Curated annotation (Swiss-Prot):
UniProt record similarity statement: Belongs to the CinA family.
PANTHER family (alphabetical): NICOTINAMIDE-NUCLEOTIDE AMIDOHYDROLASE PNCC, NMN AMIDOHYDROLASE-LIKE PROTEIN YFAY
Pfam family, one: CinA
Disulfide bonds: none
SMART domains: MoCF_biosynth (SM00852)
Protein name as it appears in the record: Putative competence-damage inducible protein
Domain of life of the source: Bacteria
Signal peptide: none
Lineage: Bacteria, Bacillati, Bacillota, Bacilli, Bacillales
InterPro entries: CinA, CinA-like_C, CinA_C, CinA_KH, Competence-induced_CinA, MoaB/Mog-like_dom_sf, MoaB/Mog_dom
Membrane-spanning intervals of the chain: none
Length: 412
């Protein structure tokens, strides 16, 4: 079965909000074996919406609409689809009572336009809105299925999970779709693809989809099977083949981001961490503290942006700052070692470099040094040559910090 997602709302076309509903629905539909080949966005205009409906009917079995179910004049989705299908709109008594009770409870006037939210297509399966007012609905006609959902994600997502997915499962073949994301760092997308190109070229079931994202590369493995455990076996076989070739760059699965993996390993090792941040200006420490329970391993950090802080707080010798510069291997080494000592941690990590857009100390933007000092281990400094905008360089530097921390922790 093929579906098309039609998002209705001029605010989407103006870029005022992102179409996160389409991403959510595509992922959920794929998991139950429904293909999505088109996303359409159309403004609050009945003529253009009608054209979008006609185009979708030519290429999809299931048309899923988000948005346009509210009380205002520009909420046109129900009316346009009713006219297109030559169906009446009727009041759903449960929804009408829910809306009426809300206005009574809040002491507000229950106006005629608010009643509009309780209108549904005649004969439709009604999906209760447990987090808002306008119900969703599903109707089958002319060998097509039309699903109408509210636009706000906080209403649409729980409605889909509770009511729409069970409704849609009636149209699926019973095949389950199982996906696993493999995460890699320290290798470019093109390099990784070359190493697994024959597997990508020969893919059938499971499929392999590479994606590069801000210094990382992921491979999404997706298998179809009526039995979930069999789908998992198919994926495991391909994963084993991939990791035989590029396993040195692999660090985690699915939502296991670098900062999470590094901090979890710190906890398991029972070690503590401190950071000295010049270039990154607190980005690294901020990501550290996104992890719950991190106070057991994170002593704190020093944002040593000015050379005075490097010299007087973290004791980088004046000679190093004048001779080698703040952006240097020697400075990164002192910062990592001394923040570890000052904050009495087991591990010190440091970041210094040039984010751009201009050069500094006659060093080009993207020149970066990450220092890592671990007790009873020699200090290591990792030189990096990064590209991108100022913000991208800073964010990628922080990621490299987590990556090198994770890899060193694996070794000890």
């Amino acid at each position: 079965m093929n579906a098309e997602i039609i998002a209705v709302g001029t605010e989407l076309l103006l870029g005022q909000i992102a179409n996160t509903n389409a991403q959510f629905l595509s992922e959920k539909l794929a998991s139950i074996g429904i293909n999505v080949y088109y996303h359409t966005v159309v403004g609050d205009n009945n003529k253009r919406l009608q054209k979008a409906i006609e185009a979708a009917e030519e290429r999809a079995d299931i048309l899923i609409f988000t948005g346009g179910l509210g009380p205002t004049k520009d909420d046109l989705t129900k009316e346009t689809i009713a006219a297109s299908l030559d169906e009446e709109l009727v009041y759903d008594e449960k929804a009408l009572a829910l809306i009426s009770n809300y206005f009574k409870r809040t002491g507000r006037e229950f106006t005629e336009n608010n009643k509009k939210q309780a209108l549904v297509l005649n004969g439709a399966t009604v999906f209760a809105n447990d987090h808002g007012m306008a119900p969703g609905m599903g109707v089958n006609k002319n060998r097509k299925s039309y699903i109408l959902l509210p636009g706000p994600p906080k209403e649409m997502k729980p409605m889909y999970v509770s009511y729409v997915e069970p409704f849609l499962r009636n149209f699926t073949t019973g095949e389950n779709i199982y996906s696993r994301v493999l995460r890699f760092f320290g290798i470019g997308e093109s390099q990784l693809e070359v190493k697994v190109q024959d597997l990508i070229d020969g893919q059938t079931n499971p499929t392999i989809a590479p994606l590069a994202n801000d210094g990382e590369v992921t491979l999404r493995l997706t298998a179809k099977h009526q039995n979930v455990s069999e789908a998992e076996k198919l994926i495991q076989h391909v994963e084993d083949l991939i990791l035989e070739r590029v396993g040195e760059f692999f660090y985690g699965y699915d939502q296991e981001f670098l900062h999470y993996k590094a901090i979890e390993l710190l906890k398991r090792k029972g070690l503590t961490l401190a950071c000295a941040e010049s270039l990154t200006g607190g980005l690294f420490g901020n990501q550290v503290t996104e992890n719950a329970g991190v106070s057991s391993v994170f002593k704190g950090g020093v944002i040593c942006y000015h050379n005075d802080v490097k010299q007087y707080v973290l004791r980088v010798p004046e000679e190093v700052l004048h001779t080698d510069g703040a952006v240097s291997k020697e400075c990164a080494r002192y910062l990592a070692e001394n923040v570890k000592d000052v904050l009495k941690a087991d591990i010190g990590i440091s970041f210094t470099g040039v984010a751009g857009p201009d050069a500094s100390e006659q060093k080009e933007p993207g020149t970066v040094f990450v220092g890592l000092s671990i007790k009873d281990e020699p200090t290591v400094v990792f030189p990096l040559n990064l590209s991108g905008s100022r913000q991208q360089i800073r964010e990628r530097t922080a990621k490299y910090g987590f990556y090198h921390l994770y890899k060193k922790l694996e070794e000890i």
